[in-house]
From Swiss-Prot:
This is Photosystem I P700 chlorophyll a apoprotein A1. The lineage of its organism: Bacteria, Bacillati, Cyanobacteriota, Cyanophyceae, Synechococcales. [4Fe-4S] cluster binds at residues 601, 610. Phylloquinone binds at residue 710. It catalyses: reduced [plastocyanin] + hnu + oxidized [2Fe-2S]-[ferredoxin] = oxidized [plastocyanin] + reduced [2Fe-2S]-[ferredoxin]. Its EC number is 1.97.1.12.
C-alpha cells in the first residue's frame, strides 16, 4: 500500500482552552457482534481462513483503522487503562492466592527452612504428588516469583492483609476499566492535549514518578522499615520490646495502623517521635538519620538491602524527580521548551557536521507515537536488563538471595523482557520510518545524516560482528582441539595461556581502593569493600547456612563468554538497525516505503527480493535476541552455581572454556534433575520439558517449509472433501508467508523459553 507523508499541521488553538471533547464517541455495543468492524474488508466476514489471521494481525494496528491520529491517540490512551485493569486483576489473583492457599505465615516464621508455596493441587487423577513438603506442615507447589520476599519487604505480616490487598486491587481494576471507557466515550482528550509534551513530562516525571516515589518512601518509613526492624529482631533471636512487651513472634506484631502511632514507632526509630514536621521545617534533618540511613551493604540477618537505605533512596529519588519534572515550560512561560532545545542543538561541527542539527526532530517525535514508543522501549528494555543484574548483586527483598530458583528466575525473566522490548523498539522505529517519516522535514539534520551514512554504519557493524564471531568462537574451538589432543598447557585458561579480563577486574577493584572513610553531606561515612555490592570484592553474605551473594571472581572463562555476548549482541543490533535504516529504501528496492512495514517479497526479479521488509528484520532479530540471551542466562546460571552458591564445585573456570564443556558439564550434567523428575513433586517440569521441546520442534514446520507446499496440499484435501460433498463454506487457505513466519517465530520462542524454564526450575528445586 502507498503511504503518504503526514499533512503539515494547521495552526492549533491554545491547548488549555478546551483540552477534551465531551461525548465524543457514544458507546455502541452492536459493534461487539461484528468482528473486524474497524475495517471495511474484514467487516464483510470470512470468505477464506485468511480472514481470522488478518483479524488478529490488524486488531491493534490502530493506524490502519478508520480515523486519524487523534482517534488513534484516544484508543491508545484508553487501552492504557485497560492494561492497568488487567495488571490489577493479575495482582489481585496473586494476593488472593497468598491469602487463601499459601504458607505465607509459616514462611515468615522460618524463612530459612520453609519454602514459599501458594498453590495446592487438588487430588483429581492422582496429581497431588506435585504437592511437595515445603516445611512447616505445608504441602504445595513451590513458587519462585519472589512475592513472599517482596511482601515481607512491604511489611505484610498476615494473610488478612493480603486478602484486603486482593479486594483493593479488584476495586482498582474496576476504576481503571471505568477510566478507559470514560476517557474514550465521555471525555476524550484532543490531539493537542496529547501533543503537549512539556505538560506530559511534568505530569509523568514530577507527578507519577516523583510523588509516587515519595509516597512509597512514606510507606517504607512508616510501615516497611519498622516492620522489618521488628521481624529482623525476631529472626535474629533478639526481639525488640514495645510498651514493655517483647515482640517475639508474628502474633505479637503491632498492626500497620498502630505503627503510625508516634508513641509506638518511636520505640523502634526515635526519629519518629512525633516532631517530624517540626524537624523537617527547621531543617533538623539529622533527627531522621535512624530511619533514613546510608549504611550500604546487606543486612546480615536477611541478606538484603537495609530497609532504611531503601526508604532513603525512594525519598531522595522522589525529590529529584519532582524537581526534574518542573524543568519544562508549561503554563507559566518559564523553563525549557523541547522544541527550542532540539532546534538549537547542532552538535560539534567536526564530529557531528549535520548543518541543521536536530531541526525537525521535535516535529517527528510530537507526531509519531511509533517513534516515541521506539525510544521508550529501547530505554525500558535496557533498564530491565540492568535490573536483572541488580536483583542478585544488590538483593532488595529479605531472604531473596538464598532462594536460588527465585534469583535465577528473576534474572532470566528480566533478561527476556529486556530483549523483547529492545526488539520491539526496532519494530516501532521501522514503522515510524515508513508511516511517519517525511523526508522534506529532515534535510541535513542528524536523522537524515545517519540515513545517508547507513552503508558505512552497517558495513562496519558487519565487520565487527565477523571479527567478534570468528575470534571468540575460535578461542573455544582452539581449546576443544587442545583438550582433545591432551595439551592443557596450550589452552586458553587460568592455568594455561591466560586471557584475564583486566578492565573488568579493575572496575571490581575500584571499590577496594576506595576503602576508608569520607564525609558525605556532613556525615562520616565508612567506605568498606562491598558498600555498593558484595560482588565487587566484598565479603560473603551468608544467611541460614546458605550463601546469598559473594565476591564474583572473573577469569579467562568469563573473558571468553563475554566476547560471545558481545558477538550475539552486535549481530542482533546489526539485524535490527539494518531493518530501521533500510525501512524506506535500499539499493535492491528503492521504493520500499510504498510496500509498507510487512511484505513477503517484491517479486521474483533481481535474483530474489524476499525477507527485506522491516517486519522481516524484526523476525530475524527475535531469533538472535533469543540466541544471545540464552547464552547470557546459561552463563549466569552456571557461574552462580559454580562460583557463588557452591553447587558444582567451582567447575566453571575449567569446564566452560570448551564447547564440549558447555554440552557435557552444563546442559547434560545439569539436566539430570529434569530428566529424572518422574515420581517426584518436580515431575511437572519433566512433562513441561518434553512438551516445550515439542512446541519448539513444531515451529520448524512453519519455518522450514514455504507457503506453496501447504497450498498444494490443501488443494488435494479440498478436492477430497468436494468428492464427498463436505466442502466448507469458508475456503481453507494456507498461511501467508508472513503469517507462517510469525507463527513459527512465536512457537520457536515460546517452546525455547518454556524448555529453559523447566530446565532451570527442576535443577535448582530438585537440588533443594
Amino acid at each position: 500500500m502507498t503511504i503518504s507523508p503526514p499533512e503539515k499541521e494547521q495552526k492549533k488553538e491554545p491547548v488549555l482552552d478546551k483540552p477534551i471533547e465531551t461525548d465524543a464517541i457514544p458507546v455502541d455495543f452492536s459493534k461487539l457482534d461484528k468482528p473486524g468492524f474497524w475495517s471495511k474488508s474484514l467487516a464483510k466476514g470470512p470468505k477464506t481462513t485468511t480472514w481470522i489471521w488478518n483479524l488478529h494481525a490488524d486488531a491493534h494496528d490502530f493506524d490502519t483503522h478508520v480515523g486519524d491520529l487523534q482517534e488513534t491517540s484516544r484508543k491508545v490512551f484508553s487501552a492504557h487503562f485497560g492494561h492497568l485493569a488487567v495488571i490489577f486483576i493479575w495482582m489481585s489473583a496473586a494476593f488472593f492466592h497468598g491469602a487463601r492457599f499459601s504458607n505465607y505465615s509459616g514462611w515468615l516464621s522460618d524463612p530459612t527452612h520453609v519454602k514459599p508455596g501458594a498453590q495446592v493441587v487438588w487430588p483429581i487423577v492422582g496429581q497431588e504428588m506435585l504437592n511437595a513438603d515445603l516445611g512447616g506442615n505445608y504441602h504445595g507447589i513451590q513458587i519462585t516469583s519472589g512475592i513472599f520476599q517482596m511482601w515481607r519487604g512491604w511489611g505484610i505480616t498476615n494473610e488478612t492483609e493480603l486478602m484486603a490487598l486482593a479486594i483493593g486491587a479488584l476495586l482498582m481494576a474496576a476504576i481503571m476499566l471505568h477510566g478507559g471507557i470514560y476517557h474514550y466515550h465521555k471525555a476524550a482528550p484532543k490531539l493537542d492535549w496529547f501533543r503537549n509534551l512539556e505538560s506530559m513530562l511534568n505530569h509523568h516525571i514530577a507527578g507519577l514518578v516523583g510523588l509516587g516515589s515519595i509516597a512509597w518512601a512514606g510507606h517504607c518509613i512508616h510501615i516497611g522499615a519498622p516492620t522489618a526492624a521488628l521481624m529482623d529482631a525476631i529472626d535474629a533471636g533478639k526481639p525488640l520490646i514495645i510498651d514493655g512487651i517483647p515482640i517475639a513472634s508474628i502474633a505479637d506484631m503491632p498492626l500497620p495502623h498502630e505503627l503510625c502511632n508516634p508513641a509506638i514507632a518511636s520505640q523502634i526509630f526515635p526519629g519518629l517521635a512525633g516532631r517530624t514536621v517540626e524537624n523537617f521545617f527547621t531543617t533538623n534533618w539529622w533527627a531522621f538519620s535512624d530511619f533514613l540511613t546510608f549504611k550500604g551493604g546487606l543486612n546480615p540477618v536477611t541478606g538484603s538491602l537495609w530497609m532504611t537505605d531503601i526508604s532513603h533512596h525512594h525519598l531522595a529519588f522522589g525529590v529529584l524527580a519532582v524537581l526534574g519534572g518542573h524543568l519544562y515550560r508549561t503554563m507559566f512561560g518559564i523553563g525549557h521548551s523541547l522544541k527550542e532545545i532540539l532546534d538549537n542543538h547542532a552538535g560539534d561541527p567536526i564530529l557531528f557536521p549535520a548543518p541543521n542539527g536536530h531541526k525537525g526532530i521535535y516535529e517527528f517525535l510530537a507526531n509519531s507515537w511509533h517513534a516515541q514508543l521506539g525510544l521508550n522501549l529501547a530505554m525500558i528494555g535496557s533498564l530491565s536488563i540492568i535490573i536483572s543484574h541488580h536483583m542478585y548483586a544488590m538483593p532488595p527483598y529479605p531472604y531473596l538471595s538464598i532462594d536460588y530458583p527465585t534469583v535465577l528466575g528473576l534474572f532470566t525473566h528480566h533478561m527476556w523482557i529486556g530483549g523483547l522490548f529492545i526488539v520491539g523498539a526496532a519494530a516501532h522505529a521501522g514503522i515510524a520510518m515508513i508511516r511517519d517519516y517525511d523526508p522534506a522535514v529532515h534535510i541535513d539534520n542528524v536523522l537524515d545524516r545517519i540515513l545517508k551514512a547507513r552503508d558505512a554504519l552497517i558495513s562496519h557493524l558487519n565487520w565487527a560482528c565477523m571479527f567478534l564471531g570468528f575470534h571468540s568462537f575460535g578461542l573455544y574451538i582452539h581449546n576443544d582441539v587442545m583438550r582433545a589432543l591432551g595439551r592443557p598447557a596450550d589452552m586458553f585458561s587460568d592455568t594455561g595461556i591466560q586471557l584475564q579480563p583486566v578492565f573488568a577486574q579493575w572496575i571490581q577493584n575500584i571499590h577496594n581502593s576506595a576503602a576508608g572513610s569520607t564525609t558525605l553531606a556532613g556525615a562520616n561515612v565508612s567506605l568498606q569493600p562491598g558498600l555498593v555490592s558484595e560482588v565487587f570484592n566484598g565479603s560473603v553474605s551468608q544467611v541460614g547456612g546458605k550463601i546469598g551473594i559473594a565476591p564474583i571472581p572473573l577469569g579467562t572463562a568469563d573473558f571468553m563468554i563475554h566476547h560471545i555476548h558481545a558477538f550475539t549482541i552486535h549481530v542482533t543490533l546489526l539485524i535490527l538497525l539494518k531493518g530501521v535504516l533500510f525501512a524506506r529504501s535500499s539499493r535492491l528496492i528503492p521504493d520500499k516505503a510504498n510496500l509498507g512495514f510487512r511484505f513477503p517479497c517484491d517479486g521474483p526479479g533481481r535474483g530474489g527480493t524476499c525477507q527485506v521488509s522491516s517486519w522481516d528484520h524484526v523476525f530475524l532479530g527475535l531469533f538472535w535476541m533469543y540466541n544471545g540471551l540464552s547464552v547470557v542466562i546459561f552463563h549466569f546460571s552456571w557461574k552462580m552455581q559454580s562460583d557463588v552458591w557452591g553447587l558444582t564445585g567451582g567447575n566453571f573456570a575449567q569446564s566452560s572454556i570448551t564447547i564440549n564443556g558447555w554440552l557435557r558439564d552444563f546442559l547434560w550434567a545439569q539436566s539430570s534433575q529434569v530428566l529424572t523428575s518422574y515420581g517426584q513433586p518436580i515431575s511437572m517440569y519433566g512433562l513441561m520439558f518434553l512438551g516445550a521441546h515439542f512446541v519448539w520442534a513444531f515451529s520448524l514446520m512453519f519455518l522450514f517449509s514455504g507457503r506453496g507446499y501447504w497450498q498444494e496440499l490443501f488443494e488435494s484435501i479440498i478436492w477430497a472433501h468436494n468428492k464427498l460433498n463436505l466442502a466448507p463454506t469458508i475456503q481453507p487457505r494456507a498461511l501467508s508467508i508472513t503469517q507462517g513466519r510469525a507463527v513459527g517465530a512465536a512457537h520457536f520462542l515460546l517452546g525455547g523459553i518454556a524448555t529453559t524454564w523447566a530446565f532451570f526450575h527442576a535443577r535448582l528445586i530438585g537440588l533443594g
